[in-house]
Amino acid sequence: AKTRAPTAHSRFAVSRPAPTAYFTIIKGCDNFCSYCIVPYRRGREKSRPIPEIRCQVENIVERGVKEVTLLGQTVDSYGHELPDKPDLADLLTELNSIKGLARIRFLTSHPKDMSQKLIEAVASLDKVCEHISLPVQAGDNDILQAMRRGYTVQYFQKLIERIRVAIPNVAIATDVIVGFPGETREQFQKTLDLLSDLRFDTVHVAAYSPRQGTSATKELTDNISLPGKSRRLQTIEELQSRIASEINAQLQGQTVE
């Protein structure tokens, strides 16, 4: 049997576990965080044009899909390299008008690309779920700089404040890496303090592991023991479990979607 070569369109294939679909709108990454191999493996960012995305979303909605999740390594940097430079807020506005589509989500965002325009789009568009995934990765500025994240703790705190002012009922998820090379107990405590202060709905935590080809592996010494990383990971999981329980307790007796 002949095997058909992949087309430019099929490279952006969508999985369709109806009634939901996960839909890649941008591939690659331009950020080059020191611990991440993605930019080297997947190349620079490449966005799909809005008309193409709308057409395919309309097609899957006709087949019964009610909810789409827009995907990208840094989904909120969508469109900057396209000729007319649309952004994610423009795309959300376009998809919000599709008849039969009930919900729109997107992930994962980068703090430096989370614009006020995008925040206001989430607040105002009725089909866009009030949920934002926004990885902080660490609560110490020196660690963030070593990670090459491109923002400070103070910037991130103000960003979360702006989001919560604009979207009072927003659910925010974040990611944290523990045991990054050189992370001291004091620096880890700053991450705990930040999580306690910002009280995220969900925290995804991972222990740092060297990735061949990344600048962190080339330039930094992985000096935190595996048991030490495991203890820090468990500490965050226990903290977040308490926070999530307290948040959920406030919802008792309410009807929520």
Region locations from a protein language model:
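Conserved SAM/AdoMet-binding glycine-rich loop
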Residues: E62-R185
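Short acidic, glycine/proline-rich loop/turn micro-motifs
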Residues: L144-M147, S215-E219
